[in-house]
Amino acid sequence: MKKSLLLLLTLLLLGLNATSSFAKTDKPNILVIWGDDVGMYNISAYHRGMMGGSTPNIDRIASEGALFTDGYAQQSCTAGRSSFVLGQHPFRTGLLTIGMPGAKDGISDKDPTIAELLKNHGYVSGQFGKNHLGDQDHHLPTAHGFDEFFGNLYHLNAEEEPESEFYPKDPEFHKKFGPRGVLHATADGKIEDTGPLTKKRMETADKEFLAASLDFIERAHKAGKPFFVWHNSTRMHVWTHLSPEYKGKSGYGLYADGMMELDDGVGVLLDKLDELGIADNTIVVFSTDNGAEKFTWPDGGTIPFKGEKGSTWEGGFRVPMLVRWPGTVKPGTIVNDIFSQEDWLPTLLAAAGEPDVTKKLLKGHRANGKTFKVHLDGYDQTALLSGKGPGARDEIFYFDAGSNLNAIRYKDWKIHFTIMEGNISEAYRKSPSWPLIVNLRMDPFEDGPDSSMYVRDFYADQMWMFVPAQAVVGKFLATFEEYPQRQAGGSLSIDAVMDKMKAAASRQ
């Protein structure tokens, strides 16, 4: 009898402990893993063996969750990263231009990050690896809701510029215009410069960032806190400096070797979730900041789309995008609907228990000790991901780094009013006599305009869409009256955007 009572008491205590532990972590953890300039076809879940090189750990996210065919970012680093963490189009926040060492522009404290909004739900947030949202202390993630940051602030080739024989040797020049080192910062205002990100350090920097992400996850788990971790690998931005461990490992060249390193890191993160027993309560997202950079091949990515990073063809904006969300996303799902990086903020806030964050922010919403009044350009895509409804997004706006609106996509149709042609180092705008029209379900790689029969057999019958396209852009720009641009991202005003688009349409 005593043994039975003891057993019953033990079971009750175990049950109470389990319930107490679950209560602390009932909100889903969020792990967002980003590569840098990663090509869609450099991931084997996309290339399906067409190319050499495999990424079994990244593929695992797809097989246990969803793979997106129409996932969109922006045309370059800063724009793509800001759109994700702020949920606003970078034309609105003024973050379309690539952030540089010594620059004064960067993320504004008037725009809430995912980390700040998650504070209301008890989350701890860490960002590790590349940031690229501003050079100054007040731009650092820890000034914008993140509890900890360990990483670099710029694109890799900017980090190694001081090693050039032509780089000015004057210490004052470097102090004013040179890249800062790899920083370790915390929300209490402490900032430690751990030293420059040299070519040599680039060989193993991702291991440093990986260790920091793992440590943060473990500490959050032990504290019973839901976490948001944004882990940013340096792979595969140029120039790639591999450690001896990965040189020649794939048998398919430098890029595939680097992808093996990136994939191994993803595997370590996924294994950590399994080890801690929290994989079933963690949303995992994999993506990147912009379209692949192809002109530096073989130290460049591979994609099936026309164009590349810096252009306004699909190759500049479409990115690999995968999500594993146990209990919400059915394993093996293929998502063909339009999904943009801005959509993650309202979607993840809905997962945390706040599906109306967009409406709240329009009126004024308090988070992280501040009141924010902003217009989110992202949509809550929970219904799409859960299979309970259609996608919420119909449109994509293709702005370049100079704040020029070059093209729009509305549902299946894309209209190029102007085109950013070429690679990011020499891209130039060209204005076709008539705007180009592409049906992206018929012609996802935008080959049609190169066809000799394009005008006669397709284009001439589609000019009806010029005026409706202006209405779509007009609706977007109308929101700027109450929620204006945060800072000038270029020389083009909102009125000029509409004027140039109308002028392009009138040329037909």
Cite the ranges covered by each PLM segment:
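Formylglycine-dependent sulfatase
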Residues: K2, L7, A18-P435, L440, ...
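Hydrophobic membrane-targeting signal helices
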Residues: L12-A18
